[in-house]
Amino acid sequence: MNHSLKPWNTFGIDHNAQHIVCAEDEQQLLNAWQHATAEGQPVLILGEGSNVLFLEDYRGTVIINRIKGIEIHDEPDAWYLHVGAGENWHRLVKYTLQEGMPGLENLALIPGCVGSSPIQNIGAYGVELQRVCAYVDCVELATGKQVRLTAKECRFGYRDSIFKHEYQDRFAIVAVGLRLPKEWQPVLTYGDLTRLEPTTVTPQQVFNAVCHMRTTKLPDPKVNGNAGSFFKNPVVSAETAKALLSQFPTAPNYPQADGSVKLAAGWLIDQCQLKGMQMGGAAVHRQQALVLINEDNAKSEDVVQLAHHVRQKVGEKFNVWLEPEVRFIGASGEVSAVETIS
């Protein structure tokens, strides 16, 4: 148990794993998984560890997915990209813009790897991965069988997909296929983007605005460890939203296609005067209440205690119960984040 996980999670929480293996191709990944499984060890596959909280030492093998490569197919209607799971997401966004292939600009500066993007159906500023995803290539770990899932088969939801359910722990994502339509249409529904002029705006301007919003509001994990948005924005029924808005008319709310309403978790937390609140080494970020940070050598217990406190305060004030977006990892695998902080 002497391999530190600190460099492999952006929260910078110091726990250990029995083994850590970097896999640069599918075969190395399969070999590492099969070797660990044969020895009866649990296995966790990570990209950049930007959406995990290790609760304790991991009693198994952590495989770091570093499968690289970007292939582009130019079709009359769209650019089709085949991207290795180990590619850095933000570098991919920058690369596509430099090559004149817009469509990912709203998703700039989301931390992590391309392979993690379908698991969470990553999203920001009005765009989710499902908008541009053509397929996801995975490998069945027990058999080595290759499987390609269409976007529909991925069953994307809000921060959700089949990779959090039936495919969890059984399949590893090795590549993601993206479709970027040549008829670019800006999405300017959130934040400072609403100020941009839809008829003249360029993809680069959207990218710059998103980067500006993220860098001014969000902490740099190299300075204060964090995993980005700690909580999901809660999606509530129209009735719940109506009741809440009658009491708090200024609450940001986003009606969804199915009649439900998405609320802004950051606003709810902020209304409870929790910005800057610290427990042990963990704190609520002072600019963006949705982010919990490693202020001062935080232990995982500090983060859990703080998350519990935030959830309680928001629940008591608004009767809305926040759920973590971050994945909680116990000694032998993922555990329920909601149960851990309830």
Curated annotation (Swiss-Prot):
One of its GO terms (molecular function) is FAD binding. GO terms for cellular component: cytosol. The keyword Oxidoreductase applies. Keywords: Cell cycle, Cell division, Cell shape, Cell wall biogenesis/degradation, Cytoplasm, FAD, Flavoprotein, NADP, Oxidoreductase, Peptidoglycan synthesis. Pathway: Cell wall biogenesis; peptidoglycan biosynthesis. PROSITE patterns: FAD_PCMH (PS51387). It catalyses: UDP-N-acetyl-alpha-D-muramate + NADP(+) = UDP-N-acetyl-3-O-(1-carboxyvinyl)-alpha-D-glucosamine + NADPH + H(+). Its EC number is 1.3.1.98. It is found in: Cytoplasm. It is an enzyme of class 1 (oxidoreductase). InterPro entries: FAD-bd_PCMH, FAD-bd_PCMH-like_sf, FAD-bd_PCMH_sub1, FAD-bd_PCMH_sub2, MurB, MurB_C, MurB_C_sf, Oxid_FAD_bind_N. It comes from the Bacteria. Residues 13-183 form the FAD-binding PCMH-type domain. Cell wall formation. This is UDP-N-acetylenolpyruvoylglucosamine reductase.
